[in-house]
Amino acid sequence: MCIRDSSGSSIKLLGAYNDFRITAIGASLIKPRWTLTVPEAVERSGALSICDNAETALFFISRGSGENKDNRPIKGEYYLTDEEKAALSEAAAKYKNLIIILNTGYPIEMGFIRGLGASAVIWTGFSGQRGSESLIDILCGKVNPSGRLADTWPIDYYDSPSAKNFINLDDNSPIYSDDGKRFGASVYYEEQEFVGYRYFDSFKKDAAYYFGRGLSYSDFSVRSSASFESGILRVSAEVTNNSDVPGKDSVLVYVKAPRGNEPRPEKLFCGFEKTALLKKGERQTLTIDIPQKDFSHYDKNIHAFILSKGQYDVMVGGEADKIKTICSFVLEDDVVCEKTVSVCREAEKITGVDENGNVRTDKTKITEAKKAIAVHAEYTSPSYNALPRYSGSPITLSDVKEDLTKLDDFVSQFSLRELADFTVCNGSCWNPGKSGAAGKLASSKRLDVPTLYMSDGNCCVNLNRPTTGFPSSNLLAGTFNKSLAYKVGKVLADESKENGISINLGPGGNLHRNILCGRHPEYYSEDPILTGTLMAYQARGLEENGVIATYKHLIANNMEFERKSAHGIIDENTLRDLYLRVFDKAFSLYKPGCVMTSYNPVNGIYPCENSALLNDLLRDEWGFDGFVMTDWGSYDTADSIRSVCAGTNLLTPGSKKHFRMILKAVKRNEISKAALQHSVKQIMKVLVRCI
């Protein structure tokens, strides 16, 4: 709603406008170079003014969010307070135009708000250092919005199926132990693949706003066609601006696929593109090529992504429940898109969702202490041959940068103590060198390996000094703009280099399984294709401009409650179709230098200890050739030596204790020097790109 077009330039500010939030807390915290309050942004706009007698009111509702703590379904967090409801009702009765500003990091209660008859509802998210200015620019018509929701907003929290199995406060004691390891609260993914629009659309449940919802001051028309040939779905969409207002539009592609014998979503989002700024009458043709794997489903019985036989409807539009079929094609037989390895197999069958979309109440239970772990007994860590000892002229890391074939000889020069040193991140408490960097890698004057620093940074270079503060990742996802994600990565790289940072601990690619996850702003979306695509473009922007990116957190880091031990019970089809598909898609587009594992165990094993995950899947199937690090302090619950044996290359943040632990493990033959050499080789392959 453009205020100047409807009621002049005067506005009244109500609600939490003085608490306007621009950032989450934790890993995605920004420390902006500068920012404006909402009143300052109004004054600076020159187009609007604050007036007690205005006919238009902006009512601000603010909610914080971030790392270490999930949000709760209580008044003042997910739900509106009684005071907020009373003030909203009063404003709706008093003002001709009521515009509600949702300055929240996650979706909140919408039932009451929808009943107010507000002129407009705007979600700002945590919009970075220019958030208040951007909001006012949109309201006064200086900027034409073109975003779409990257998540479905339910009317009520308990409308979402994962609400029944998010934080299981009735079962938060360890369910079993294995050699002293503690597994915390059980988290049963009974909703399976029915997350977000996949649930609401498939079972025709009412939602406040669907995935893909978005408004603009422009009016666009889209003419589309599609073809399916040689495993590629090609969609051509001609977008025309039929209005006087220049604007951008995004085209979203979905496929309605046969459901087969298992409960599966009605349709799948599988591709998108965004136009340039189109003036009145201008048109642009977008071509969207979608690999068939992106609308396939996983069959754990044959360990493959398949397309079931039957009719496929190709659909184009925006909001998931308001899209149109543009063509159909029929497969006479099942098609195997890709054979895979099996990882993280569940110990018992998940009971799942019934035919009406109800999450069953007879929860899956792991009843035997060793059952989940026994499933993984077949997984073995790889063995390596020790490198022949090099006896020529000393080789430095700079020599390896010039000639990568010298890598083996270079690493063979490392002593056992040096190998152990490079397996442990040398810095903790986010203060190496007092810069606020998250950590630093080991260095060696003898081998000419410099000290390299890393920092958090999905939306800023997170240090003890001001840097550019971008909007949070869930807001970036709402742009549906690949090139913009790349540009964010580029600027993060430029500022990282200015501040002596070589490795960015982002982007984060965990899904919005539940809207109350504390790290909701830090992750992109409820959809794996959108998330995987944007994180790949952001990572490319970082690395093509000289800073290493880190895909995190592998796998299913979907809650902060007991995050180092909360035990996810997830069937393999769901893992492959949702929580692994994010990374699968990202790796198909860009392979970064680093991967960070998640804290949480999944199906009886911690990801940093899971050799099948780190080797068979990550390295062999996905082609990753960088190094794997734990999340900070994963060794509080996971086993450090098992992690290194399984293929984890770097323990973070690390300490002398872990250095000594590795040396003792070598003496006890729990880990070989050859395995450490292989691990350090993976790290050095990445470091040569930083010097």
Ranges and model annotations:
Residues 323-327:
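Extracellular and select intracellular beta-sandwich modules with Ser/Thr-enriched
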